[in-house]
Amino acid sequence: MFQKVEGIVIRTTDYGETNKIVTIFSREFGKISVMARGAKKPKSRLASISQLMTHGHFLIQMGSGLGTLQQGEMISSMKEIREDIFLTAYASFIVELTDKATEDKKNNPYLFEMLYQTLHYMCDGVDPEVLSLIYQTKMLPVLGMHPYFDTCAICHQETDFVAFSVREGGFLCFRHAEQDPYRIPVGEAVHKLLRLFYHFDLGRLGNVSVKDETKRQIRTVLNTYYDEYCGIYLKSRRFLEQLDKFQI
């Protein structure tokens, strides 16, 4: 049976001398993996459509196991991302997180739209670090994680947040911050932005400007929380940390 799907390539794996296994996150079926025969050959009609982060329409011969990619029609090559090492690093983080967080053939149109919007915002020049933080925040419920971003994790009051507690699973107000000796001190902007990132419609994203220190604190909160409750290892995250460390 042949199926035409709209999707974004989120992973490629070389298979033999000339073939690739291409993982596509599709609007219709969620994550699907297909064999792209001959895609490693420079003159192959599948060479360009099977590149990482390519957005396109794919004609797939579906089966009980691995499908076969027959042909594709490119919508966007994400050229702006490919030509910039920073954009490539952040986009790689986003697609790898999507891959690791999802199961095969689980339809999720909301997640497809979020992935599509994030990558296209990146191509349009929106701060890639902020976009990656938004995406990482919005992936929390997809992974079954629901931290307290709206109220204190202990007293459940909406007031004066001064720290984030991984142990308690959310923000702490000034009255209860001392209860966790391993709390992460945060500024007021961190709470406001994380709550915003968690709830707002990504399609309504306008001009965004976040201070470097605020981004650093948000990244610390999210990474620490993911490490404790998620257990997903991302190679792309390590590369981002190296970029930041060496300020390439």
UniProtKB/Swiss-Prot annotation:
A single Gene Ontology CC term: bacterial nucleoid
The biological processes this protein is annotated with in GO are: DNA recombination; double-strand break repair
InterPro entries linked to this entry? ARFGAP/RecO, DNA_rep/recomb_RecO_N, NA-bd_OB-fold, RecO, RecO_C
Q: Which UniProt keywords apply?
A: DNA damage, DNA recombination, DNA repair
PANTHER family given for it?
DNA REPAIR PROTEIN RECO
NCBIfam families, sorted = reco (TIGR00613)
What's the protein name? DNA repair protein RecO
Gene source species:
Bacillus cytotoxicus (strain DSM 22905 / CIP 110041 / 391-98 / NVH 391-98)
- Gene behind this protein: recO
